Every structure is written in structure tokens, then in C-alpha cells.
């Protein structure tokens, strides 16, 4: 038996401001194979909105749009008491001594997910930097797999499949009271 998921652009998915995560619970608690239909890089859903300034790519107010936003499409930095916490940490696994980058300002290159400090001091307790999911379209899937510690499979053609498909949207609306 297989559980199929279709990303539909839910901005709350694994976002720290939204503790209620029914799809995450579904994936973690299923004993079925999980298949996610990936975002196609060439679809009509652009990663930037009309009128967006290209050079705002690294600003926290302008994360890229995507079919499968995860963590709000930003890396979250929390710092205080001499410690720095990064979520998702996947991008920074090579850092062995976080104290060397504590209270530093972070940014990234335009294309790809090469994050670096610009050397400027940043004492804000919380800040975020958008990550690139457009030029790395499978990145949300890898982040999800890394976060949940579950094996995810990537599907590529749902038209031939006859099993039940669970859309993220359907799962969320079943668990939310949307009455006005």
C-alpha cells in the first residue's frame, strides 16, 4: 500500500510558527510507502512574483515561492546565551564549531544554497535567510526526509497509478475547522 502526496503550496508546512502539522504526523505515523510527486522546475509557477526585485533574494521578507514550501522556504537562526541554533541544520552540517559564527550576519549566493557570513555583527535573537528551492527543485523533499528521518520516494507520473492519492490540501482541510 502506498501513500501519495501532491505538494500544493501550503506555506505553513513545517513552519515554526504553525505547531499543528497534520501532514507531518500522517507521514511519520504511516506504515505505508510514501511517494511525493515533485515540483516541476518548468511549470508555470514562478519562484518570484511579478515586480519582485531580483536582488532581494537574500532578504527574510522575500522567500521564493514554490509548490512545496518547507520551513517557510527560509533558514531560521536563533541565537542567545552564546549559542546559535539553525533550522533546518542540513545546510550547515559541515560547521564543527558554531561559536565561530555566533552573532554573525548570514546571507547566501543568488543561485544555490551556499550560505556564508559577511563578517558583520548580528545580535538579533532571531533572523532568517531564504533558501533556494527553484534551482534545486528536489531540495524540499530532501529536507523533509532529513527532518522526519523517513524514506520518501519521488514519483514522476501519477496518470498511470491507480492507488489512492492524498493531497496535502485535502488532508489539511479535513483537520481544520474552516467554518466562518
Give the location of each predicted region:
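Conserved serine DD-peptidase/penicillin-binding transpeptidase domain
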Residues: 2-180
Amino acid at each position: 500500500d502506498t501513500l501519495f502526496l501532491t505538494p500544493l503550496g501550503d506555506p505553513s508546512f513545517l513552519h515554526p510558527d504553525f505547531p499543528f502539522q497534520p501532514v507531518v504526523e500522517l507521514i511519520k505515523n504511516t506504515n505505508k510507502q510514501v511517494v511525493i510527486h515533485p515540483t516541476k522546475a518548468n511549470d508555470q509557477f514562478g519562484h518570484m512574483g511579478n515586480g519582485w526585485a531580483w536582488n532581494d533574494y537574500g532578504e527574510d521578507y522575500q522567500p521564493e515561492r514554490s509548490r512545496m514550501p518547507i520551513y517557510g522556504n527560509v533558514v531560521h537562526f536563533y541565537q542567545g546565551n552564546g549559542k546559535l541554533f539553525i533550522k533546518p541544520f542540513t545546510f550547515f552540517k559541515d560547521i564543527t564549531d558554531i561559536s565561530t559564527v555566533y552573532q554573525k550576519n548570514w546571507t547566501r549566493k543568488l543561485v544555490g544554497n551556499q550560505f556564508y557570513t559577511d563578517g558583520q555583527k548580528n545580535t538579533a535573537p532571531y533572523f532568517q535567510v531564504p533558501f533556494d528551492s527553484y534551482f534545486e527543485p528536489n531540495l524540499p523533499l530532501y529536507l523533509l526526509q532529513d527532518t522526519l528521518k523517513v524514506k520518501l520516494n519521488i514519483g514522476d507520473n501519477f496518470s498511470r497509478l491507480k492507488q489512492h492519492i492524498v493531497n496535502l490540501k485535502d488532508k489539511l482541510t479535513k483537520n481544520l475547522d474552516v467554518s466562518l
